[in-house]
Amino acid sequence: MTFYNDLITSLLYTTAIFYIFKGLNRNKYLYFIISGIIIGINSFSRIPNILDYGIILLVILHALYYRETVCLCINRCLVFTVSFIIGIMGIISLMKVWGHYEPFVNNMRELLFIAEDDSGTSSHTLSNMIFAQVRIYYLVLKLGIKIVLLYIIFWGSAKYIKKEVVLLPVRIIVFSLLAILFYKENVVFTLCAFSMVGILGNIVLNKDKEIKMLSWAGLSMIMIIPLGSDGGMVNNGSIIYWLGMPMAISFYLSIQNIHIPAIPQWAVRQTLLLTLGIYILACGAKAICDGVYFDGGPLFEKRYSIQNDRVKHIYTSRERAQILNDLLIGIKPYIKQGDHLFAYGSIPAINYMTRTKPFIGCSWPELLGEPLFRHKLNNYSGPLPAILRQKFNSIGKEFGEPSENYLIDCGIETGPFRSNKKHRVINEFIEKNKYKTVFENQYFVLYLPEK
């Protein structure tokens, strides 16, 4: 497993939650200090993590549940807040010592520029970030409604159909539809739906205050961490459920101790067990038949590796491996380790594989909005980089068909990734600086400036 920013985010977040609960249970300010500093540090794993400061609400909720004094609550919040600021200032101080502060500030300026971009060619505008969350929760709600309707049919049939010969086919149909639903929907949506129901069930129905508090913590993790991602929780995957899922499971296991009106306890437990079994089978079938993230197709086809020391243990299909191996062999005579490589398209890993430096400080310049992209290229004054471009769309589970015309017209524009406006910007840069083609095949083309 790669130890990347989202994983670091979840690790530090759960650690901070652990210490804030120790502080609440033992009434020791030291733990609030540790928790606040960790949250401050975590703000630099991903900039949106600054919103993790919102876990201070757990201190307020604890005061409300346990009827603690306002003075005690305020003191805890102040200690946590000051510690949070200390964590941030500590990282900034280290940045200045190591010479990282100026690049960080420049990056922040660019992020603010991107957030305000209204050109329609940037993936991480503020409006896109907000809409992503709304869209995802809308899809989760739709899925939840479908599941509930199937449950109603299941429970209703058990109550009103007395003949087993009729009841059995109805149940088979219901759970077959449920299996199809789980297979077709995003796995993360299903996790979210079941986690939310379980967490909210604990918060509303469970009388144990500790369980309520832990459920609030799990809910905060699910709600906060996806903020700042253009794909919402889809991009974060299952790591946002480290707290929420255990609390949801605790609710489902405790149903026999909780009275739920109009639904027999045996029916709920039986349905949940069947649902869990179907979900596991559907996920297994999906993983085997439907491929993995950005690499569709049956899993047994992923037997071929890329001839590169850095990714040789990552397996893909024969076709994809061949495409990438041909690329690496073809560009090897023209670039060397430490060179600047301007890789335009959805191919940010090429800098990593070739040990080259990303041009304009970004390994995925396709994500930049057209105004910022144009500004960076027009104001660049250093040595000209090698330019690598792809002739096909690689976003999604399957590679698109290559086309010679793709370098000019990417066809149907899909959001911020495939944009003819940005194609014109890079074509102008190539023409202005008199680049020439040194390598080209069906899928890629490499340009070098004339000497």
List the predicted regions and their residue ranges.
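Membrane-interface transmembrane helices that cradle and orient dolichyl/undecaprenyl
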Residues: 14-32, 42, 64-68, 156, ...
